[in-house]
Regions:
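Glycine-rich loop-to-alpha-helix module at the N-terminal edge of alpha/beta enzyme cores
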Residues: 10, 54-143
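Short beta-strand-to-turn element immediately C-terminal to the catalytic PLP-Schiff-base lysine
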Residues: 48, 68, 163-167
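Active-site and channel-lining beta-strand-loop segments
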Residues: 36-57
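Tryptophan-centric aromatic hotspots in well-structured domains and transmembrane helices
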Residues: 16, 21-22, 63, 87, ...
Length: 197
């Protein structure tokens, strides 16, 4: 059975999920016992689960579907691009028309001093790359010791090694010897949470 088009009953999907899918920030045994919520479809700002319950997606698919679901015009453009050139990297002095066109448009829309665009597959990857790029920049400038990054306590920047280090969330730091060296955290801008009157 093709699970992408022919949906099994919720309990069977939950059993397969528990057997094979690792969820982030989750106690897997507890989730396996109760079963994950299975999202079946989405439209606009709403999600529908495999039992037919509809939810407002206030997290925009975890912050990456801020234009809403089911946008036909975007699906059409994406399908056209997938047929022409679904993906290609820009390593090894190579580029492609979508990267050129989007970079030019973003530079046009951005303030005058922001004219160069670097693409990444996720926010976490972008943050990790920025840590490396900033440190490399200062090393090339002859200041390799200028490598301290200041971030906020309780900030979430992603779950990769560098991004979790930037995020000042102690439970994440305890999962793997984080933060990486020279990332320091200052208080979050929350007067009451920090003990203010």
């Amino acid at each position: 059975m093709n699970l992408m088009t022919n949906h099994m009953p919720t309990a069977e999907l939950q059993a397969l999920d528990a057997a094979h899918h690792m969820h982030p920030f989750t106690a897997q045994a507890e989730l396996a016992e109760k079963g994950a919520r299975v999202i079946k479809s989405a439209d606009g700002v709403f999600l529908t689960d495999s039992d037919g319950t509809q939810f407002l997606d206030a997290m925009a698919g975890l912050w990456c579907v801020n234009i809403g679901y089911g946008r036909g015009e975007l699906a059409d453009v994406a399908a056209r691009q997938m047929r022409e050139l679904p993906y290609y990297n820009t390593f090894f002095q190579t580029t492609h028309v979508p990267a050129i066109a989007l970079s030019a448009k973003l530079a046009e829309l951005a303030p005058d001093n922001l004219n160069h665009i670097f693409y990444a597959g996720s926010g976490s990857e972008a943050n990790d790359t920025n840590i490396r790029m900033v440190r490399h920049y200062w090393a090339v400038q002859g200041a390799p010791d200028k490598n301290i990054i200041i971030s906020r306590k309780n900030a979430y920047h992603g779950s990769t090694l560098g991004s979790a280090s930037l995020g000042g969330m102690l439970p994440m730091h305890e999962q793997g010897g984080l933060p990486v060296p020279n990332i320091h955290h200052i208080n979050q801008p929350n007067w009451w949470a920090e003990g203010g009157d």
